[in-house]
Amino acid sequence: MSHEEFVRYQREVHRPLLMAIPEAGRYIRRFVLSFPIPAPDYSDPDYDSVVEAWFDSMEDMNALYFSENFLKKVSPDHVNFMDLSSHGRVVAEEEIVVD
């Protein structure tokens, strides 16, 4: 899959699939898809996108990711556009330095 096909799939197929389940609207507070752009003097990134999903709590995050709807409708779609052997996930807490 080309990078352009990946971006299209993530925007037009996978994101709507996620947003269609009620748990997404209930638990996600902010959802950001970022795609690399050419930048002089910077090497090509190792990833095709960065996805940020923000939640009020770890419990809310788990309520989404372990919900029946997510496990049956959203998670199985990952193999259609992601290389699961090279994908990473970070759970983090934000520390604002400049606002």
Describe the predicted segments one by one.
Residues 1-99:
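Macromolecular interaction modules
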